[in-house]
Structure formats: structure tokens, C-alpha cells
């Protein structure tokens, strides 16, 4: 601003227009928005700062259905340890999935192995309850879900806090009695505890 003192018709000051400098505007983003920006910066990075995180592949062809299915398979990052072994495993899984016999192993369709076939294959390894039933062509996977694999014993009464406390107390008493019956172990343990306490 320039202040004028002697002119009566004009106000006491006037605004002088500055010529635009070649360096551009001076401000926070002045250096970034120049015609020749700093290397690595552009006006696009200001509007979309996260685009550098997601790199595009070099493929610019149209995608087909096969490409879409291949891209849905997850792959570990390249800096992952044992990358070669993991990628080999992924490739082998992909190859095995394309195998024609995959449908037989698919859990949705089931193995379709019946008890008659399974008895010859597995022999005595079948569940012991299966010999008591004539099930014919029932799927083995269904039987595995319906029959328990362990013998279950029902408790005489319902569990309560008192019954749990009593059973725990009886176990502790039994362990103490067993410990008294084996004096050599308890003496060596007491000797070790005495030795450790005397050191520290």
C-alpha cells in the first residue's frame, strides 16, 4: 500500500497492483502446484492421497471370467517369509481343485462311501456301534455325525457348587494321602526346597 498525502480528490491511500511473479504464489502449497512440480508430487496426489497404496497390475486387457476367478484366490505378500513354499502350496491346491475327482472329495456332495464299501476298506476301524444296525447304503459321514465317538457316563445328580467343591476337596485329600505314601519323593522335594531357599 502506498499512502498519498497531498491529493485532495483521492482518498488518503490507494492500492497498487503488483505484477504476478514468476515464482508463483507463496504459500503452503505454492511449490507443489507450480507448472514443474517437485518430483513425486502432483495436484492429483492432493486430491487422491491414498492411490499410491493400491498399485495396479500391468494388465490392461479386458478381464474374462477366468481372470476374475484367478484374481479371487488370495496370495500372501511378496515380503512374507517362506514365500516360495507358500506359493507352491497355493499352486498345488489350484491344480488339485481342477482335478476331476475333486467333486468326490467335496464336503457339500459328500464322499458317498457307504457302510458296505467302508467295512471292506476300513475293516475293524469302523465305529463299534455300526455292527448292530442294518443301515445298508447310508452315508458314513452322516453316521459319524449321529453316533458319539466316546462313551458318555451320566452323573448321578445335577452339578451344584457344593458338589463341585466336595469333589475337588476329595481329590486334594487323595493326592495328599498319595504324597504321604511316597516318602522318598516328598523328602527329595523338601530337600530341594530347602536348598533353593538357602541359596536365595
UniProtKB/Swiss-Prot annotation:
Residues 56-76, 175-200 are annotated as: Disordered. Component of the IFT complex A (IFT-A) composed of at least che-11, daf-10, dyf-2, ift-139, ift-43 and ifta-1. It comes from Caenorhabditis elegans. Expressed in ciliated sensory neurons. The keyword Endoplasmic reticulum does not apply. The gene is ift-43. Keywords: Cell projection. The lineage of its organism: Eukaryota, Metazoa, Ecdysozoa, Nematoda, Chromadorea. It comes from the Eukaryota. This is Intraflagellar transport protein 43 homolog. As a component of IFT complex A (IFT-A), a complex required for retrograde ciliary transport and entry into cilia of G protein-coupled receptors (GPCRs), it is involved in ciliogenesis. In particular, may act redundantly with the intraflagellar transport protein ift-139 to regulate the transport of specific ciliary cargo proteins such as che-3 which are related to motility.
